[in-house]
A protein has these predicted regions:
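Basic, flexible Lys/Arg- and Gly-enriched helix-loop patches that mediate nucleic-acid binding at interfaces
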Residues: 1-233
Length: 233
């Protein structure tokens, strides 16, 4: 793995990692390395003499691609855990909630069971923001149906949701519950079936635009604090 990538896995930004490397602060197997593209194993790397290990509980943000299951294992299909770096795979990560197989965007993977439980608890009403491409352009009165809530399905009645159109004509939805296929069912209810769907944020933690699909990184200290505050921890 590239040296700069290893450093970013511990919470440094790409720019911070490269500056640290060029300053000679990173070592591989005890030797200073100033090449950001140098290939190394994470367990060989230190920064200012400190091993690049992630202590305690760890939460990753993943940019989930389409076609991937939000599950811990599957015999036939790729899962979100397949994208966890090899040197972290033994830490016991699990997904926080679920995204449908065809949905892309933010998935949180954590070793902290209490954090995961609180974030998905209906009582906490953690906000999740989605961006949907839907068939035809919804009218304002149709968006108002979503904002008011009270849409009755066989298994639940929807809570009030944020619903706005972007300049590109995409539907931005903010939900505080995690019912089965909720976004798709709400959009179909107002006559605008979903063509594609992406999750942008959970509990105020936004998907890093620098992450390509299939990439993940640990949360920054600020993101971690924000998420724990939302979870009441």
């Amino acid at each position: 793995m590239r040296l700069d990538k290893i450093l970013t896995l511990t919470g440094l930004t790409r720019s911070q990692a490269r500056k640290a490397i060029s300053a000679g602060r990173a070592q591989v197997a005890g030797q200073p390395v100033r090449d950001a593209a140098f290939l190394a194993r994470p367990e060989e790397v230190t920064l200012d003499g400190t091993p690049m290990a992630l202590p305690g509980e760890v939460t990753l943000m993943l940019h989930k691609p389409a076609g991937v299951l939000t599950a811990t294992e599957d015999r036939r299909l790729p899962t979100v855990l397949d994208f966890v770096p090899d040197f972290l795979k033994n830490r016991g990560f699990g997904p926080v909630g679920r995204l449908d197989r065809d949905v892309t965007g933010l998935v949180l993977l954590t070793t902290d069971g209490q954090l995961a439980h609180r974030l998905i608890s209906p009582r906490r009403r953690v906000e999740k923001v989605y961006l949907a491409q839907v068939e035809s352009r919804p009218r304002e009165e149709e968006l108002e149906i979503l904002r008011r809530g009270g849409v009755a399905f066989s298994d639940f009645v929807s809570l009030p949701a944020g619903a706005e159109l972007t300049e590109e004509g995409l539907l931005r939805l903010t939900l505080t519950e995690g019912k089965y296929h909720e976004v798709k069912r709400l959009c179909a209810h107002i006559g605008h079936p979903v063509r594609s769907l992406k999750r942008l944020s959970i509990g105020g933690v936004e998907l890093d635009p620098a992450l390509a699909e299939g990439q993940c990184r640990p949360l920054t200290a600020e993101e971690e604090a924000r998420l724990r505050a939302v979870a009441g921890l």
